Amino acid sequence: MGRDTIAEIITSIRNADMDRKRVVRIASTNITENIVQILLREGFIENVRKHREKNKYFLVLTLRHRRNRKRPYRNILNLKRISRPGLRIYSNYQRIPRILGGMGIVILSTSRGIMTDREARLEGIGGEILCYIW
């Protein structure tokens, strides 16, 4: 049985965010690098750096936490895996769902690479819905 690297990075980021950790380390692959670049561009994480350890590459992510008056930290990341190896979910560009009325993002794998729902609508292409982030 194969590994689902997208589910692994989503779970790692979600667990680190709930545990109020500032830094999380994930395995580096082409897919994870593209997803992390989208998270960085959309402002969900602060910083990314590539780290090499014994011929393996890792991405070290710095998570963004917001201060709240009542509680010291507020969890800002909600990530949900949609298409998985056992059940692939595809959508054309007209039926890509809007998360929280456009406040969240949908990450898609298209024929032109991994992109957000806004980019896919602008280019007029659909693809496999990887995850929701809000």
UniProtKB/Swiss-Prot annotation:
Pfam families membership: Ribosomal_S8
InterPro entries linked: Ribosomal_uS8, Ribosomal_uS8_CS, Ribosomal_uS8_sf
GO molecular function ontology, one term from the record: structural constituent of ribosome
UniProt record, GO biological process: translation
PROSITE patterns in the cross-refs: RIBOSOMAL_S8
Keywords: Chloroplast, Plastid, Ribonucleoprotein, Ribosomal protein, RNA-binding, rRNA-binding
Superkingdom field: Eukaryota
Function: One of the primary rRNA binding proteins, it binds directly to 16S rRNA central domain where it helps coordinate assembly of the platform of the 30S subunit.
Family statement: Belongs to the universal ribosomal protein uS8 family.
Protein name: Small ribosomal subunit protein uS8c
Natural source organism: Nicotiana tabacum
